[in-house]
């Protein structure tokens, strides 16, 4: 009789240990560790299960990576376009805020307020671009070292900034960034139209900001303004004029 009780206790202990191990495994999987169980059904992406048999794939199941023409190489195009745009937007965030603080001259208050608007708009789109990059399965790199090394944009001068200097600087800077983003739209529009649409929105706002700076100096038939009034009687040079 004692042997029977002992056997029951041992068996019960083994069963309890197995259950606890199973629970720990389930908890580990729930904490973000990928499951290696090949029988786990693939997420429902609206495509046949034959296209989603690799449960160990590092790519997420979303529109950017399950399009018929897409895959690892096309994902790289989207990530590169988004990361480069993010880096440039972050550089512009820093530069617009630097100019917002330090602009001087006749138009200092107008530019002070305008640059704050630009800073807020650029910050909003920087966040959208970073989150889109996460949506397609890559991390976003917003570190200061990355901004300095990879933005490939001229640095804004330190110290006080003359209003004419600020206008010229951002007219060129926005033009450069807008042209780069326009190129990226073409690079990704077929394989990742959602990313392309977002980049078009960014391009639109950057072109708007470029116009708002350029308009301070732009000639019209009735006003041949070239910046004399804010540049000590000398024209402010702009390309194409």
Swiss-Prot record:
Annotated GO CC locations: cytoplasm
SUPFAM superfamilies, per database record: Ferritin-like
Catalytic reactions on record: 2 Fe(2+) + H2O2 + 2 H(+) = 2 Fe(3+) + 2 H2O
Residues binding Fe cation 1: 100, 127, 131
Chain positions recorded as Fe cation 2 binding sites: 131
Compartments it resides in: Cytoplasm
Enzyme type, top EC level: oxidoreductase
PANTHER family: DNA PROTECTION DURING STARVATION PROTEIN, GENERAL STRESS PROTEIN 20U
Protein name in UniProt: DNA protection during starvation protein 2
Gene: dps2
């Amino acid at each position: 009789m004692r042997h029977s009780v002992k056997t029951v206790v041992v068996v019960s202990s083994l069963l309890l240990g197995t259950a606890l191990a199973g629970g720990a495994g389930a908890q580990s999987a729930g904490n973000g560790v990928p499951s290696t169980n090949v029988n786990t059904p693939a997420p429902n992406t609206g495509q046949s299960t034959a296209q989603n048999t690799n449960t160990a794939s590092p790519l997420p199941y979303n529109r950017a990576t399950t399009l018929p023409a897409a895959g690892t190489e096309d994902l790289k195009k989207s990530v590169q376009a988004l990361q480069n745009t993010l880096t440039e937007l972050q550089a512009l965030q820093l530069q617009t805020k630097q100019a917002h603080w330090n602009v001087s001259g006749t138009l200092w208050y107008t530019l002070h307020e305008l640059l704050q608007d630009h800073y807020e708009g650029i910050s909003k789109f920087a966040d959208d671009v970073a989150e889109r990059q996460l949506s397609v399965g890559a991390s976003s790199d917003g570190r200061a070292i990355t901004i300095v090394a990879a933005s490939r944009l001229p640095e804004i001068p330190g110290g006080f900034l003359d209003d004419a200097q600020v206008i010229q600087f951002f007219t060129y800077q926005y033009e450069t960034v807008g042209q780069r983003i326009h190129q990226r739209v073409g690079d990704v529009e077929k394989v990742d139209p959602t990313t392309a649409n977002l980049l078009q929105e960014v391009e639109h706002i950057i072109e708007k900001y470029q116009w708002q700076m350029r308009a301070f100096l732009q000639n019209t038939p009735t006003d041949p303004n070239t910046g004399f009034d804010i540049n000590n009687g000398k024209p402010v040079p702009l390309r194409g004029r």
